Amino acid sequence: MSTAFLTLIAVIVCILFRILNVHSQPLKPSVWCLDAHFLDCLYKIAPVLREPYIPPRLWGFSGHVQTVLHSIVGRVRCPWPLGERVYMSLKDGSTLTYDLYQPLNEQEDDITVAICPGIANSSESVYIRTFVHLAQCNGYRCAVLNHIGALRSVQVTSTRIFTYGHTEDFAAMVEHLHQKYRQSRIVAVGFSLGGNLVTKYMGEDQKTKPDKVIGGISICQGYNAVEGTKWLLNWQNFRRFYLYIMTENVKSIILRHRHILLSDEVKARHNLNEREIIAAATLPELDEAYTRRVYNFPSTQELYKWSSSLFYFDTIKKPMIFINAKDDPLIPEDLLHPIKEYATTRQNTAYVEVAHGGHLGFYEGGFLYPNPVTWLDRTLVAMVGSLVMMHEVGKVAP
């Protein structure tokens, strides 16, 4: 066997070891929290936060592998919870749907978990189904917002789809749930884009929210779209590749409903160029060609600033828990500094940072094969319980 061949094998092995990050060890999550009472309640109901997160040994310490597996596989042996689809007609002519799942086990408290999925996702997304099933088994009712345009089986009936910052659809679902279950307390849970929407919704003081909304949980959001898009346009850490995938997902929804979203009347009204929309290779290009025009923003920078939850932190009145992974390839550490500062200066707020997990991955398991339920699923269910307990015992600071 030649020296050159052996050298090549050695280089490949070194690259694989570096990508898989196999030298890493399981670590306990880091928690930023000013409020001692809040933190005590969180640890009491979610003791998993005191324990090391142990991903699959071979590949689980790589944020890239976790992220790619999440986007391709989602979860293993995923259940398909049985629920009902609720249809709502909004004032702008949009057809909004959400899927409603009743608890499988009785609990003393009537709790509804209002779930906002990630970009272009819905109740049919595998990671959402896994979390819903686990929450049902723990006695929680779940409602999952289907982002307008995301479901192939539901036609778009107005000239818009979801965006990164418009919270009206989520607010409409929460209000409908409140009218339907008057005594139920509501915990809002958002994943990625949904985390931004939930946080922004909680901080929009000009919008009236039901008093039964007792808190929110945000997972894997970037907080600041203005700065976040700059990072995503960089090829470092393969971010430009991830941005391309997200762009194609949103673009495919627009083109799937082009007979309404890109009708001649709509294109004339908003000065849309269909060729520019089709040619867009990044979200900023797509938002310049489509989103900011449909919503009448003077620039994408204005759209991104208005959409970013970071600028609504100071007006959040209810308890919030934020979760991010340090190795999330979509969200660099620089974007996490503001949430750390916020959590250490505000009551009723906690920020949990996990060393590994990627973007919405957080798989657990042995050497190779992951468990059906992830660390994130288990932790979120416990966090919902901690918010409920804090509300009940009156430890939420005024």
From Swiss-Prot:
What does the record say about its membrane topology?
Single-pass type II membrane protein
Per the record, the coiled-coil ranges are none
EC number assigned by the record: 3.1.1.-
Q: Where found in the cell?
A: Membrane
Q: Which family does it belong to?
A: Belongs to the AB hydrolase superfamily. AB hydrolase 4 family.
Q: Which residues lie on this side of the membrane: Cytoplasmic?
A: 1-4
| GO molecular function terms attached to this record | acetylesterase activity; lipase activity; monoacylglycerol lipase activity
Q: From which organism does this entry originate? A: Drosophila melanogaster (Fruit fly)
Q: Which residues belong to any copy of the AB hydrolase-1 domain?
A: 113-365
First-listed, main subcellular location of the protein, grouped into a coarse class = membrane
Question: Matching PROSITE patterns, A to Z?
Answer: UPF0017
Q: Which key words tag this protein in UniProt?
A: Hydrolase, Membrane, Serine esterase, Signal-anchor, Transmembrane, Transmembrane helix
What residues make up the catalytic site? Answer: S192, D328, H359
Protein known as: Abhydrolase domain-containing protein 2
Q: Which domain of life is it from?
A: Eukaryota
The uppermost taxa in this organism's lineage are: Eukaryota, Metazoa, Ecdysozoa, Arthropoda, Hexapoda
Which Pfam families does its entry note? Abhydrolase_1 (PF00561)
Q: Provide the Gene Ontology terms for cellular component.
A: sperm flagellum; sperm plasma membrane
GO biological processes: acylglycerol catabolic process; lipid metabolic process; medium-chain fatty acid biosynthetic process; medium-chain fatty acid catabolic process; sperm capacitation; steroid hormone receptor signaling pathway
Q: Which residues lie on this side of the membrane: Extracellular?
A: 23-398
Transmembrane parts of this sequence: 5-22
